[in-house]
Curated annotation (Swiss-Prot):
Group of enzyme by EC: ligase
Keywords for this protein: ATP-binding, Ligase, Nucleotide-binding, Purine biosynthesis
Gene this protein is translated from: purC
Pathway(s) this gene product operates in, as recorded in its UniProt entry: Purine metabolism; IMP biosynthesis via de novo pathway; 5-amino-1-(5-phospho-D-ribosyl)imidazole-4-carboxamide from 5-amino-1-(5-phospho-D-ribosyl)imidazole-4-carboxylate: step 1/2
Protein source organism: Brucella anthropi (strain ATCC 49188 / DSM 6882 / CCUG 24695 / JCM 21032 / LMG 3331 / NBRC 15819 / NCTC 12168 / Alc 37)
One of the record's GO cellular component terms: cytosol
UniProt-listed Enzyme Commission number(s): 6.3.2.6
Keyword Ligase applies: yes
Classification via Pfam families: SAICAR_synt (PF01259)
Name of the protein in its database record: Phosphoribosylaminoimidazole-succinocarboxamide synthase
Length: 254
C-alpha cells in the first residue's frame, strides 16, 4: 500500500492511484464519523462490511443499466473504480421523515412522506454541508441544468431499485445519500453514480421492529454498529448464516 500514490483521503475512504490509466483503488477505512467528523471512532470491521455491501449494490446497479464508477472488488477492503470528476454535491433521497428533515420541518420520525423527496447539499465540511437549491448549483457552476436532470433521474432510479432490494429482505429504505461524477470516455461525458452506498450512507430500518441497521447507531450512541451492518450483509446474502460478531471484525463470504 505504501508504494501506491495516495490521491485523496476522506473521512471513511482513501483513494489510491489505480493499476491502469483512468482507474483508482478505493480503500474502506474503519473510521466512523458523524456530524462532519466532530464525532469520531475507529470500529473494527466496519470498512470490510461497507466494502462488501457497497460492492453488492453497485454490481446490481451496473447489471440493471444504472451507470456507476464501480469495476470490481479487489480484496476485503478495496475496490477498483473508474476515475471520475466528482460533482461537489451530496444527493439525498428521502422516503420517510428522519434525521434533519424531521427536525427541520417538525415531522414525527417515521412519517412516510407523500412522495420521495430529493435534496442537494454542497460538499463542504467547514460549512457543515449546507442544503442548496438548483439555483445555487447552476449559479455557482457546480453542475449544469442538463446534469442536474441526469442526477435526479439517476437518484430516482437508484431509489426505486434500493427500495425494492431492501423491502425483499425485510428492511425499509428510509433515506440515502449518493454522489455523482462525470465520467469522460474520449470526448463523451456521462454522469455516473460514485462514492459508496452502504449503511454508512443510508438509513435502514427493520420493517417489523423499526430497529436501526445503519450509522444512526453510532450517531445516537446506541452501540451494536458492526452487528447491525453484519445483519444487513447477512440478509443480502453476502455473509454466512452461521457467522457471529467477533471483536476482530466480521467473516464474510469470499
Amino acid at each position: 500500500m505504501n508504494r501506491r500514490r495516495r490521491i485523496y483521503e476522506g473521512k471513511a475512504k482513501i483513494l489510491y492511484e489505480g493499476p491502469e490509466p483512468g482507474t483508482l483503488v478505493q480503500f474502506f477505512k474503519d473510521d466512523a464519523t458523524a456530524f462532519n467528523a466532530k464525532k469520531h471512532e475507529v470500529i473494527d470491521g466496519k470498512g470490510v462490511l461497507n466494502n462488501r455491501i457497497s460492492e453488492h449494490i453497485f454490481t446490481q446497479l451496473n447489471r440493471i443499466g444504472i451507470p456507476t464508477h464501480f469495476i470490481r472488488r479487489l480484496n476485503m477492503r478495496e475496490q477498483l473504480i473508474k476515475e471520475v470528476e466528482i460533482i461537489p454535491l451530496e444527493v439525498v433521497v428521502r422516503n420517510v421523515a428522519a434525521g434533519s428533515l424531521a427536525k427541520r420541518l417538525g415531522l414525527e420520525e417515521g412519517t412516510v412522506l407523500p412522495r420521495s423527496i430529493i435534496e442537494f447539499y454542497y460538499k463542504a465540511d467547514a460549512l457543515d454541508d449546507p442544503m442548496v437549491t438548483e439555483e445555487h448549483i447552476t449559479a455557482f457552476g457546480w453542475a449544469s441544468p442538463p446534469e442536474i436532470d441526469d442526477i435526479m433521474a439517476l437518484a430516482i432510479r437508484v431509489n426505486d431499485f434500493l427500495t425494492g432490494l431492501f423491502l425483499g429482505i425485510g428492511i425499509q429504505l428510509v433515506d440515502f445519500k449518493m454522489e455523482c461524477g462525470r465520467l469522460w470516455e474520449g470526448d463523451m461525458m456521462r454522469i455516473v453514480v460514485a462514492d459508496e452506498i452502504s449503511p454508512d450512507s443510508a438509513r435502514l430500518w427493520d420493517i417489523t421492529t423499526n430497529d436501526k441497521l445503519d450509522k444512526d447507531r453510532f450517531r445516537r450512541d446506541m452501540g451494536g454498529l458492526v452487528e447491525a451492518y453484519q445483519e444487513v450483509a447477512r440478509r443480502l446474502g453476502i455473509m454466512n448464516e452461521n457467522d457471529t460478531p467477533r471483536p476482530a471484525g466480521p467473516t464474510l463470504v469470499k
